[in-house]
Amino acid sequence: MTTQGLILRRLAAGLLAIACCAPFLSAQQLRVTYEYKYHPYKNENRLNADMDMTLDIEKGRTAFYSETEFMSDSLGCIAFNDNGETVDQDAYGKLTRLSRGSCKDYILIENGNTARVQLSDGILHLSYSDTYVQPEWTIEEGNYSYRGYTTHKATCHFMGRDWIAWYTEEIPSSAGPWLLSGLPGLILKAQDSEMLFDFSYRYISAIEDTDSRYEQLSSFFIPRPDERKYFFSGSSKEMGLLYDKIKNDASLENQLLGIISSKTLNKDGSLSDQAPKERISIIPVEYWKSK
């Protein structure tokens, strides 16, 4: 190949790379998928991982949710009527075959200043709306390469935990996973200082107006008639404290769900009290108590 031909080939490859990246660099609406790893219980090495935590970035609003949970709730709306009766066998069949993730929370942020949060275990749903205040970040010097992007490191103390984040200015969005945002570029990775919670970018795509899920996600905050007894709403402090109490008190959770006993069935057929496990919440209960 001649020198001129080689130059033209390299130029064409460069232009193609720019064209492929352009939609992400200029798009105002993006869908970012993260892997979310966390330790659910104290004094245990168990690690949960959700591979499909999704951040939708739209004009003036963001949504953070599990793709699997979104599909589950969407199919549930089709499969059942308001009385909980099965009305669509096809949707019901897909729902029963769906593998559920462990994180079932929804977070919607509108206009950068109002957060709607639903804490859920799949049955109990606690929701609140509150003024959203972005973390106050300290940006450190230096560049870091992360999955093909040049990133910068930032730290903050936010909602009871110390956080470390890596963001890229190559994607001009101040959004990030969970309630983390406010940096001069998309947050690709974030973890707390104790390494109990970790969000890691997996892939990104542009979304069209017709593919917006925001309104549908908003509808999941409204209880269906057959689920009303499992929905609670109030201030952020009330719901944060209630969620912590329910998840750390098996007898209270069972009482709310109408389960008579919280005992464990042993192999010999006898019953014994469940050993209490202390959950680790991404927002520590101490934060809610001090609020």
Go through the PLM ranges and name each one.
Residues M1-Y34:
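Bacterial Sec-dependent N-terminal signal peptides
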Residues C20-C21, C77, C103, C156:
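Generic recognition of cysteine residues
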Residues C21-Q29, E110, S173-P184:
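Short, surface-exposed loop and linker segments with low hydrophobicity and enrichment for Pro/Ser/Thr
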Residues S26-P135, E140-N143, T150, I164, ...:
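Extracellular or lumenal secretory-pathway regions
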Residues Y146-R147, F158:
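Structural motif
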Residues A154-L217:
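Gly/Pro-enriched, hydrophobic low-complexity segments
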